[in-house]
Amino acid sequence: MKGQIQTMKPIKNFIVAVGLTLALSAITNNAHAQGSNMQEKVKNYFLQTLKKKQNEEQKSKDAFQRNKTYTTDIQQLIKNKDIAQNQKMVWDAWCEANRELNEQKLAKPEDLRKGVKASWNLPEALEKNAVMPYYYGVKGSAAGKLPLFLYLHGSGPKEQEWATGLILGNRFQDGPSLYFIPQIPNEGDYYRWWQVAKQFAWEKLIRQALVEGNVDANRLYVFGISEGGYGSQRLASFYADYWAAAGPMAGGEPLKNAPVENCANIGFSFLTGADDTGFYRNILTYYTQIAFDSAQLARPLDADKRPLFVHRINLLPGMQHHIKYDLTTPWLKNFVRNPYPKTVLWEDYDMDGRHRSGFYNLQVLSSPTQNRTYYDMNIHNNVVKINIKEVEYTAVERDKHWGIEMRFNRSYTNAKG
């Protein structure tokens, strides 16, 4: 059918083509003697691909929104016993390519208490005059790799909100950890953490942070307050395959903007004041709670018999927009990402006009529709089953003042093509 999906599954002998989505999905090589030559070949492929993406996406918003998938004809037959060795080789090649790429690098983390500032220039094609200042710092010390928290601030004056983020980041009891605390580049209509220029920043952050080697790839967390609550709820769903857990606070998105099914396999905390009526935040948080509870009842366990929708969504009694912020990150830190889930639920939707090119170990080679597509994958006894459906939303509740679509019905039809 037209809706083609590429998956990876373990078998004794197999051929896998090197592919690149946001990070890495590749395994190659079968002989130790040829290892260095193959690693150089793979590194050069990665580097050229990164340069192509950089050239295309920084010059054209359309190119960034298309999110082109790159492939290669590099192939080698490998045996099961050599998989780990070749995974390391490919990862090393990926890291080398990223270090050689000419781009603004992520600052070296210092003690977060110092408040050392750095910044990235985001592509002009995605947002004019967009400079993203950030703090990138470490809390405490520990042997090995650290969890990374991405904190998104609220929509007050951006300098003040950013400074508050640094104070909160140092205060929260989640160390040892790393913190990335960005400042919104532009206010007004661009004061949204989910727009394409910011997507560029998040993908760059994840890519560069993992390459540096001091971040635990399975302990990435996103959370935020108010506007940052809206943003982190959207990013939780859109990038769920990268997070261990997510924690919006004092927000509330219509669920068309953040489908809950995508948050299967991660921890999800959502805290809002019970009396936070602005933009219907308390009502939309309640609708999110109902949706997660319903998803949990419908699919309580994944294919490995593990809980699929672990969530904590509470309306805090007697509180309005200001709530207890310290409750979120200690809860999030308990979660470790499962990089190879055997149950994947994914509603593929656009965020600011841009779709993902893949999700976990699924890669979309061609989509059956330009609209939304829902993928339900289960792996059992090395058999992969994928159901693909087209999704249609119908609004069943709108607010009378702003016309916000509050609730929806969804209908599903089998994908064709």
Task: Give residue spans per PLM region.
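Bacterial N-terminal signal peptides that target proteins for export
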Residues: 3-18
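The feature captures the conserved acid-bearing segment of alpha/beta-hydrolase catalytic domains
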Residues: 245-333
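Bacterial N-terminal signal peptides
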Residues: 17-26
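Gly/Ser-rich "nucleophile elbow"/oxyanion-hole loop immediately N-terminal to the catalytic nucleophile
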Residues: 139-144, 190-226, 240
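A domain-start/cap signature at the N-terminus of enzymes
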Residues: 34-146
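Primarily recognizes the serine-hydrolase "nucleophile elbow" in alpha/beta-hydrolase
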Residues: 218-264
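Alpha/beta-hydrolase-fold serine-hydrolase catalytic core, especially in secreted/extracellular enzymes
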Residues: 35-73, 293-417
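Short substrate-entry loop that stabilizes the transition state in hydrolases
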Residues: 141-191
